[in-house]
């Protein structure tokens, strides 16, 4: 348990951290954030989609069992990632080297 917090509050913090973790992974896969392993922005749309799908699954599985704050957060993150994914998917792939 997180020091000094009730189990309920600690779990709320863990849920929020998990949502932000998947959001960050998706943003790296979308090329919106620099990949800390390569120090470059790289697009991997299938990975981004997997992270978004995982968040959608988490939302469905936790329905009715999260606070209003948690629900608003996951809804907003999924919406934001979905819009960013659509934006990136609409862009042409990098041109092949000549």
Please provide the spans of the model-predicted regions.
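Well-ordered alpha/beta subsegment
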Residues: 61, 65-69
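N-terminal intrinsically disordered, cationic/polar leader segments
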Residues: 1-53, 57, 69-98
């Amino acid at each position: 348990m997180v020091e000094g917090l009730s189990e309920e509050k600690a779990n709320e913090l863990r849920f929020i951290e998990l949502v932000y973790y998947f959001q960050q992974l998706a943003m790296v896969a979308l090329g919106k954030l620099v990949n800390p392993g390569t120090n470059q922005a790289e697009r991997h749309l299938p990975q981004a989609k997997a992270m978004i799908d995982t968040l959608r699954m988490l939302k469905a599985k936790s329905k009715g069992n999260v606070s209003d704050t948690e629900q608003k957060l996951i809804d907003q993150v999924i919406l934001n990632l979905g819009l960013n994914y659509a934006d990136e998917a609409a862009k042409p792939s990098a041109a092949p080297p000549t």
